[in-house]
């Protein structure tokens, strides 16, 4: 009976040790491919995204047991997710969404963990355009108000209130959809 206990204990110890052994080396190119594959499968987008640009990481260590960071830019393609076509066959959309992504690989975890954060490019320019549109809209509204001087003050106040409410809702909706997407997954080696 004691022999059986020790044999079982030895098998359990070996299994536990083998899972904590070093991970398979992951080159920078493989890490980019894996990150892109994870984004396309987990982000919930309708279109596939393809690598537009990768920032070289000279300090990338494929044998590292710590964390590794990579930065890259992806762009929306004409291919849909459900088509399951190779990315090389998918051209970029003319006005496709461009995302700047940062990926963190945590190799010290068992199993290793990847966390991706992607944010749309051009957020500042879009905000400036939105402000210009709002200013133009306010000017038009002021012109209309001058024409509508015969209306009661109550109607004017309600109109002004609902205009502010509309602009506020528009702004919040745009902000909501600009939030970065964060994806975290574990992957086996």
From Swiss-Prot:
Swiss-Prot/TrEMBL keywords: Antibiotic, Antimicrobial, Cleavage on pair of basic residues, Disulfide bond, Membrane, Pharmaceutical, Secreted, Signal, Target cell membrane, Target membrane
Propiece residue ranges: 23-155
Location of the region described as Disordered in the Swiss-Prot/TrEMBL record: 125-152
Keyword Secreted annotated: yes
Domain of life where this protein originates: Eukaryota
Biological role stated in the UniProt entry: Potent antimicrobial peptide against Gram-negative (MIC=0.25 ug/ml against E.coli ATCC 25922, MIC=1 ug/ml against P.aeruginosa) and Gram-positive bacteria (MIC=32 ug/ml against E.faecalis, MIC=32 ug/ml against S.aureus). Adopts an amphipathic alpha helical conformation, that may allow to partition into the target membrane. Low hemolytic activities have been observed on mammalian cells.
Protein's UniProt name: Batroxicidin
